[in-house]
A protein has these predicted regions:
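Small-residue-rich transmembrane alpha-helices and their cytosolic helix-loop interfaces
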Residues: 24, 56, 60, 141-149
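Cytoplasmic helix-loop-helix junction between adjacent transmembrane helices
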Residues: 109-148
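Cytosolic juxtamembrane N-terminal segment immediately preceding the first transmembrane helix
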Residues: 1-27
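Helix-loop-helix hairpin linking two adjacent transmembrane segments in secondary transporters
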Residues: 105, 142-188
Length: 190
């Protein structure tokens, strides 16, 4: 890091692992949160099972494809910029999913979610590498990985609860809210 570069982490050290964990779990969480609503979304949008599968495939393709580039973008433009732009795009895409009136719109916005959701996962690992010596980085990475593994377990329960009580649109509004909160936290602390 160059001397004139501002510090990457401006908050308390204990909070870094929590923030990086939430950044890392955004991708898997947004995959599994809407899975319980597949049949409800299909009925509401008049979509076939294949079309519903495309909402997941579009997300995964965008997620995998952009994982190739998020690291290089973060090296070129800075960790903070890539995370903030990624979360902002994720938030807009989540709102787009909630407002989708047909399956084509939903597939498009799910692809945008995928393109942007991976930024947190890639950059969180780069931040750990930047801030910690190797032995300490392993400990922080193990904490982050635990939360990363928890996301797919709790996401369907959250999505199912939202579906039952508030309808399928609420799942994507919830993800929009998560995006807004995550953006604000990163804007303040990263």
């Amino acid at each position: 890091m160059q001397p004139e570069t501002p510090p990457l982490w401006r908050g308390p050290r204990w909070a870094l692992a929590a923030l990086l964990a939430v950044l890392g779990m955004l991708g898997p969480f947004s995959i599994d949160t809407y899975i319980p609503a597949f049949s409800g979304i299909a009925r509401a949008l008049g979509a076939s099972p294949v079309e519903m599968q495309q909402t997941l495939s579009a997300y995964l393709f965008g997620f995998a494809f952009m994982n190739l580039f998020h690291g290089a973008l973060a090296d070129s433009f800075g960790r903070r910029a890539v995370v903030l732009w990624g979360i902002a795009l994720f938030t807009v895409a989540s709102a787009g999913c909630a407002l989708s009136q047909n399956i084509t719109q939903l597939v498009f916005f799910r692809a945008l979610q995928g393109v942007s959701a991976g930024s947190g996962m890639v950059v969180s690992r780069a931040v750990i590498r930047d801030l910690f010596p190797p032995a300490q980085a392993q400990k922080v990475m193990s904490q982050v990985t635990i939360y990363f593994g928890v996301a797919p377990a709790i996401a369907p329960m959250v999505g199912g609860w939202l579906l039952v009580h508030l309808g399928w649109h609420s799942i994507f509004w919830f993800l929009t809210l998560v995006g807004v909160l995550l953006w604000l936290l990163n804007f303040r602390w990263l």
